[in-house]
C-alpha cells in the first residue's frame, strides 16, 4: 500500500481480512487465522483490487540472489519470453571468487555473442541485446533491482548505468528496504 508516484510501497502486508467482532488486517489477521471464520458467501461479495493507472508497465526486473540471476524485460505489461535471461552466476559465486581469488571466467562470458543456424539454413547472430531497439529506451526508463546481490554498493549507479548508451535516461528502482524484506520473510515470501 502507498501513494501513486512513490518508488516503493509504504506498507507491505498480506491481503487477508478477518472480522469476528473487530476488523483485523494484514499480519494481525494472519496471526488470528485459526480462529477466524468467514461468515459470508464469497460468491456474493466481490472484491475489487485496483492498480494505479499511472504505474509503469514497461521495464526490466533484475533479480539476483545467492545462486541464480534473472533479467526479465516487461513491455506494456507483458513479459518478453524470448528476452528473459537466466544466469547461474550470483552472490555465492561472487563470494567464492572474492574469498579464493580465482580467475573468474564463465561460459556466459563467452556466449554473449553467438551465431545460430536455423532449420531453414539461415544464420542469426544473437548478442547481449535481446530486445527490439525501438523499446530499449522504454525499458531503461524503469529498472527494478531485487535480491541480496543487488545490495553491493554501486551496483545500480556504476554497473547498470554502464549498460545503457549515454543518450538514454535510466531510472533505477532499488528500494533500500529490499534486504529487510528478505531477512524478515526469506524465500517463503515467494512460496506462499
Swiss-Prot record:
It catalyses: ATP + H2O = ADP + phosphate + H(+). The keyword Hydrolase applies. Its EC number is 3.6.4.-. It is found in: Cytoplasm, Cytoskeleton. InterPro entries: Actin, Actin_CS, ATPase_NBD. Pfam families: Actin. GO terms for molecular function: ATP binding; hydrolase activity. Keywords: Allergen, ATP-binding, Cytoplasm, Cytoskeleton, Hydrolase, Nucleotide-binding. GO terms for cellular component: cytoplasm; cytoskeleton. Belongs to the actin family. Actins are highly conserved proteins that are involved in various types of cell motility and are ubiquitously expressed in all eukaryotic cells. This is Actin, muscle.
